[in-house]
Curated annotation (Swiss-Prot):
Its EC number is 2.4.2.18. InterPro entries: Anthranilate_Pribosyl_Tfrase, Glycosyl_Trfase_fam3, Glycosyl_Trfase_fam3_N_dom, Glycosyl_Trfase_fam3_N_dom_sf, Nuc_phospho_transferase. It comes from the Bacteria. It comes from Halalkalibacterium halodurans (strain ATCC BAA-125 / DSM 18197 / FERM 7344 / JCM 9153 / C-125). SUPFAM superfamilies: Nucleoside phosphorylase/phosphoribosyltransferase catalytic domain, Nucleoside phosphorylase/phosphoribosyltransferase N-terminal domain. Belongs to the anthranilate phosphoribosyltransferase family. This is Anthranilate phosphoribosyltransferase. The gene is trpD. 5-phospho-alpha-D-ribose 1-diphosphate binds at residues 80, 83-84, 88, 90-93, 108-116, 120. GO terms for cellular component: cytosol. Pathway: Amino-acid biosynthesis; L-tryptophan biosynthesis; L-tryptophan from chorismate: step 2/5.
């Protein structure tokens, strides 16, 4: 089946959703060789992935993933595709910490750095915030702290068959787009950062087909996979069965434009230090405002506020009150308590 599929793709044909699901199912079961997987990823990258293919692949990945159980009806994820090559600090992780401090359950789906300076798992460790090592621990953390981190390799075990081919070919593949669409906590409210607006549009349509309550897919100025503080961002808002596209600038939500250099870092520790400063309101203006902007969008996606602007205001209040700093302190104490009992 796989050889036939490769031949069809090489000839320029696209896969129907059901066929794409079967192909990914074969990959997840270890029925495709490393060279076959690499060939498929290469063909798709150069030909361009269709929404039907992305939807079928995502359905299969979701089915093969380990999921966590929880009692929340409005879980949020702030996960991006990565790969923007801009070198910013971990904005989506800072956003997750801020939003969870405001009472919104956040199931952060992420990984270690591959091509970037710092992955979400790396920076959380640098912040001494626990990374849960099992679904049970993740559920307990989500219930107790409104925040858990789901380390992607632990939940997408079947992805092991694609790890070597992805590393060997070395370029972005469809898997970069599928990760944010396969949250193990079944988050139906998402803020997804995408490095390219064309991919953001495809992902929005894919998410609409998969089903979501309210999600924002954002592509920032200069290829940033976050809402940008330095220029306009393109937003695809998916609410139920509808998709709305619009441009957003910082001034629209009461913020000022910032400087890219102020949000760039060279190491994991620099990223962690900047996040710490943001969450106590002591960071440089650009770093402070880009987290407020993205937190405002996440709060809006979570349906906790009626607009991104209102979300920005709520995020500002949370930092100014010291509540966010207290929340981070509680998360750190959990890590220290675990070490004492180890």
């Amino acid at each position: 089946m796989f050889k036939e599929t490769l031949r069809e793709c090489m000839e320029g044909h696209t896969l129907a959703e059901r066929k794409a699901e079967q192909v990914m199912d074969a990959i997840m079961k270890g029925e495709a060789t490393a060279s076959q997987i690499a060939s498929l990823l290469t063909v798709l990258r150069f030909r361009g992935e269709t929404v039907a293919e992305m939807t079928g692949f995502a359905r299969a990945m979701r089915r093969h993933s380990i999921q966590i159980e929880h009692s929340f009806s409005q879980v949020v994820d702030t996960c991006g595709t990565g790969g923007d090559d801009v070198g910013t600090f971990n904005i989506s992780t800072a956003t997750a910490l801020l939003v969870s401090a405001l009472g919104v359950p956040v199931a952060k789906h992420g990984n270690r750095a591959v091509s970037s300076k710092s992955g979400s798992a790396d920076v959380l460790e640098a912040l001494q915030i626990p990374i849960q090592s099992s679904p049970e621990e993740a559920t307990a953390s989500l219930q107790k702290h409104n925040m858990c981190f789901m380390f992607a390799p632990l939940y997408h075990v079947a992805m092991k068959h694609a790890v070597a081919p992805r590393k060997e070919i070395g370029f972005r593949t469809i898997f970069n787009l599928l990760g944010p669409l396969t949250n193990p906590a079944r988050a139906e409210h998402q803020l997804i950062g995408v490095y390219d607006r064309n991919f953001a549009e495809k992902m929005a349509e894919t998410l609409r087909r998969l089903g979501t309550k309210h999600s924002l897919l954002v592509a920032g100025h200069g290829g940033l996979d976050e809402l940008s503080i330095t220029g306009p961002s393109t937003v695809f808002e998916v609410k139920g069965d509808a998709i709305d596209r619009y441009e957003l600038i910082p001034e629209d939500v009461g913020l000022e434009r910032g400087d890219l250099a102020q949000i760039q870092v060279s190491t994991v520790q620099e990223s962690a230090t900047l996040i710490d400063q943001v969450l106590i309101g002591k960071a440089n203006k650009s770093a402070q405002q880009i987290v407020l902007l993205n937190a405002g969008a996440a709060l809006y996606a979570a349906d906790r506020v009626d607009s991104i602007k209102a979300g920005v205001a709520l995020a500002k209040e949370g930092i100014a009150s010291g509540h966010v700093a207290d929340h981070v302190r509680n998360l750190r104490q959990t890590d220290q308590e675990a070490e004492q009992h180890a």
